[in-house]
């Protein structure tokens, strides 16, 4: 009998569908009353503690999800990724971001070649270069030390490094290394972003890192040319070679741009942009800011989860459990969104990064074989640090739509504060909410409880909380570079598990391309209208033509052949 090509055709999927109605009839109040069940839904690895007992699931549900994983050949797919097989089938590429954080003596192959020596060659180059910049032996064109760095990139070249940078900013070791230095990220092609990035900086002390694998990414290269002009107008064209470096594989274009190809740092086709933070894309700017030793600890943390993911049995495997629970929530319970709620301000950029990792990876409508998916897949990811989110969108989560939540807490704060006379310290106040919110979502508040509190009859419907809203809690011991690396890898592999089970390619992103190609047509029209005064042609639909015409007429003061005008705040 042939193996079903869609996971939804398997007996394991059908078994879960049949199991669903019983779970829907069981409230979390009842499920949480079973201590043995709760204990079975707690897993620990390297002092990372996962509690998923507040999921709408019984032990039987979890066992059925493991059978679904077997039906999807999850273990084999994980092994294929680590073995360098071309699991990105539409682009015929390996998917080996795990190699980026592998120890020097490891062997991970792509197309029969061990790629780890190449990875470490680049890491050694980054270490040498970043140390020379940081100790002042590499200086700018006027002899001044380069204290400020602007990393220019977009998408995965921006969101991942920004997440790690923000998480490290208040870590004692990292922040000590960053004294007197500044790291900024320029992503948006909107000139306002360029203006904000150069505001207050001196070109003489600024190093620009241009991140583009092909060195042709439209937004990134326009921003790079803008900063090149900013540097050369102040210091002369020859200064560019001392103030700009590249993360790219296209050395001819790097050199043509004015950057010494010796100052280009490579990465590879087997690294997807959203999985590239552990490559030169993230390691170079982060090492310039915090020193390579700190960033190496981040890589070691990610590697520890890589090992756990590839070797731990599914019932103790944190990324596997998280991925399977997401499949259950999305495809069976019908919850399309997920809230990522870190109770740490240092993790404020985690949700935007995971939003890209998850939604760009699993926002697909067809299987690896090109078959339309007859079930819901992919998640809408969003989030905000606690307790800020409690005063923003938690209202909807408590009494509106059901949105499964990831609560992430840290035992020891990066920045402890104690005030005499307070009932608890600042971090304990934060964590009081971390522990309370999952129970509030799970248990809710019944009309009977409100009546016992003598709540007015007309207010009871408004103050009733139905509860039965799923969440999980992840508790980290600290939030240093090592733990940040672990957290990143947990979420990366969780996304892969979802894709492997759904049977989709989580490693391409064709949805990004269509808008790019249509923008090319618009760009040509804007040029023709600005320079030649041509009316908007018939190649656009009525709506777009109307909007374009209105835009051009309202911005007719834009010069046809402008002199260079740089942003200024």
Curated annotation (Swiss-Prot):
Pathway: Carbohydrate degradation; glycolysis; D-glyceraldehyde 3-phosphate and glycerone phosphate from D-glucose: step 2/4. GO terms for molecular function: carbohydrate derivative binding; glucose-6-phosphate isomerase activity; monosaccharide binding. Its EC number is 5.3.1.9. Homodimer. It comes from Clarkia concinna. Keywords: Cytoplasm, Gluconeogenesis, Glycolysis, Isomerase. The gene is PGIC2. GO terms for biological process: gluconeogenesis; glucose 6-phosphate metabolic process; glycolytic process. It is found in: Cytoplasm. Gene3D superfamilies: 1.10.1390.10, Glucose-6-phosphate isomerase like protein, domain 1 (3.40.50.10490). The active site is at residues 360, 391, 516. NCBIfam families: PRK00179.1. It catalyses: alpha-D-glucose 6-phosphate = beta-D-fructose 6-phosphate. This is Glucose-6-phosphate isomerase, cytosolic 2.
